[in-house]
């Protein structure tokens, strides 16, 4: 039970990453679990890959479709096997968000200019969200994902503000649905990879309170980091407490359920104006480790 069981009724939510690990936990498993409110698909790992298109690294998908191959976009994946599951999730009111980035050993989401940032926002808009260019290349066909999550861990935020503004402008073009833009910065405050001027424009920020020593959950600097992040992103942006669902992958800072519940209660007691809930990395390890949250 790695997440708080109380308080969800008052609007506190649980987001979870899925796709980067072993696929024995399916997207349907995650979407059908009432504990989870939002799924982050991990990952769109490279902004510029074969043919100038992005590269996807979603674990249980195969290679590119015929149309993608023909266009030279061989870093894209044929996501048709996930379409039904994504629709299932969305039908339950659970947004499915494309997370872009990940650990730097496996990704490259560095930008060298504002123009590149705007270009990526347009490319991703067309391939995954409400855009209509490159229809034949869309990994999930006519399914529109619900937004993007910025998981830049390069320590270089160049172009991210321009990209974020372009995403938000694109979102306005499709009034048929609500789109979200979020980020997952590291807990040392502030984070160069996800600059504050970017975070202040987002719907929520799910801070990784792990892999970072002093500001990890239950460490000495945790409370101060939470307060700094809450204030820095502004009261209009929700703050989620990011936690590991297991210590199995060599990640550092995993805490047992009771400790995480204590930490979340500690945050609740701060009465922050923008506390939104918790985030878990990662769905497969949560199941494997028996770390699913308690039901309300």
UniProtKB/Swiss-Prot annotation:
What positions does the record give for glycosylation? 32, 152, 228
The record's section on InterPro entries has: Cts1-like, Glyco_hydro18_cat, Glyco_hydro_18_chit_AS, Glycoside_hydrolase_SF, Glycosyl_Hydrlase18_Chitinase
Activity's sensitivity to pH is recorded as: Optimum pH is 4.5-5.0.
Q: Which domain of life is it from?
A: Eukaryota
Q: Where in the cell is it found?
A: Secreted
List, for all copies, the residue spans of the domain called GH18: 12-296
Q: Which UniProt keywords apply?
A: Carbohydrate metabolism, Chitin degradation, Chitin-binding, Glycoprotein, Glycosidase, Hydrolase, Polysaccharide degradation, Secreted, Virulence
Q: Which GO terms describe its molecular function?
A: chitin binding; endochitinase activity
Q: What happens when the gene is disrupted?
A: Leads to decreased endochitinase and exochitinase activities following heat-shock treatment.
Q: Return the broad EC class.
A: hydrolase
Catalysed reactions, semicolon-separated: Random endo-hydrolysis of N-acetyl-beta-D-glucosaminide (1->4)-beta-linkages in chitin and chitodextrins
Instruction: State which Enzyme Commission number(s) the record gives.
Output: 3.2.1.14
Active-site annotation: 153 (proton donor)
Where does the protein principally reside? secreted
Q: Which SUPFAM superfamilies does the annotation name?
A: (Trans)glycosidases
Q: What induces it?
A: Induced by chitin and cuticle and repressed by glucose. Protein expression is increased after host tick Boophilus microplus infection. Also accumulates in response to heat-shock stress conditions.
Any one GO cellular component localisation term in the record: extracellular region
Temperature characteristics of this protein: Optimum temperature is 40-45 degrees Celsius.
This molecule's function is given as: Secreted chitinase involved in the degradation of chitin, a component of the cell walls of fungi and exoskeletal elements of some animals (including worms and arthropods). Participates in the infection process and directly acts in the penetration process of the host cuticle. Involved in heat-shock adaptation.
Family of this protein = Belongs to the glycosyl hydrolase 18 family. Chitinase class III subfamily.
Q: Know the name of this protein?
A: Endochitinase 3
Query: What is the organism field in this record?
Result: Metarhizium anisopliae (Entomophthora anisopliae)
Q: Which gene encodes it?
A: chi3
